[in-house]
Amino acid sequence: ANKIPNIFSKPLRTLDLFAGIGGIRLGFEKAGFQTVFSNDFDKNCKTTYDQNFENSKLIVEDIKNISVEDLPEFDFLLAGFPCQSFSIAGYREGFDDKKGRGNLFFEIARIIEARKPIGFMLENVKNLMSHDNGNTFNIIKQTLQDLGYHLKARVLNSMEYGNLPQNRERIYIIGFKNESYINKFTFPEKKRLTKSFRQILLSKVPEKYYYNNKPLYARIKDSVNDKNKVYQWRRKYVRENKKGVCPTLTANMGMGGHNVPIILDNQGIRKLTPLECSRIQGFPDSYKLPNIADSALYKQIGNSVSVTVIEEIAKNIKAALVA
C-alpha cells in the first residue's frame, strides 16, 4: 500500500511574503493552495490586496520585525523578493547583521530555517542570475541547499508560458525538502500565445489617457502608426515592440511621465490603463482595482507577477506532491 498520506487531503497552507497585491497568492489559490499569512512593507498595497481577498488580509510590516513564533502553521513559502547586493560573506553573517544591512533574502532564509516548510517558490528578476557576476544567485542557492532543500530554477517568459501578450522574463526558484518531490517537479511546458494585446484593450477609456492634446503628441504621432504594436517613449524617441506583444510592465510605470506603454486606437494615441495592465499580467477581471491614484496602481501592477504563469507552476508543484 502507498504509505505516503495524501498531502492534499487538506489544502496546503502558504505564507505569502513580499505579497504586493497578491498576484502569487492568486495563482496558488487557483491551483488549490490556501493562504494563511500575507505580508508586505508597502501600505499602499493593502487597499488593493484587502479588497480582493476574504481572509488573511495584508499585514503591513517590515519583514525584519516579523518573528517566526508569530507565524501560523504553514506548508509552503511564497516570496517575490527584491534583488539586492550581498555586501556580506554569506548567510550566517547576514543573520547576525544587526545594523539592518542584512539582505531581505536572509529574512526568507531565517523563516525557512526556523519552520522548515515542505517547500517554497521564490520569484525574482532575470538579472538575479547575472547580478554581481553571479555571486548573488550562488549565495542564494548555497544558502537554500545548506538549509536542506533541493532546488530547480528556471527563467520563464510570460508570453511563452502564461499565454500573455507581455515580454516578461522572470526567474522562479522551486525548493523541496524531500528529494523525491523535486525529482517529480517539472516546470510548465511552453504554450502557444493565442492572446494579442488587442484582445485585452478596453473599447472606451477616459480622455486623460490620450496624448492627442498633450505636448508630447507632436513628437510621437508619426512613429506611433500601427494599431497592432505597443510602443514606449524613450525620452528622445519612440521604441516599437514585437507585433502584438507588450514590453515588460515595471514598477516605474508609477513614476508618471511616459513609462506606461503607448498604443494607437480608433480615437488616437494613448497609454494603457491600469485595468489593461492588470489584464496583461494575467489578473482576471474579477480582480478589483480600488479607486486610488493611477500612479499607485501602475506601480503595484508593474511590481506584481504574471498570475497565469504562477498558476501553471503551482499546478506542477501540486502534481509533484501528489504523484
Predicted regions and their residues:
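A short, Lys/Arg-enriched amphipathic alpha-helix followed by its capping loop at the start of a domain
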Residues: G27-Q34, N52
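Conserved SAM/SAH-binding beta-strand->alpha-helix loop
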Residues: D42
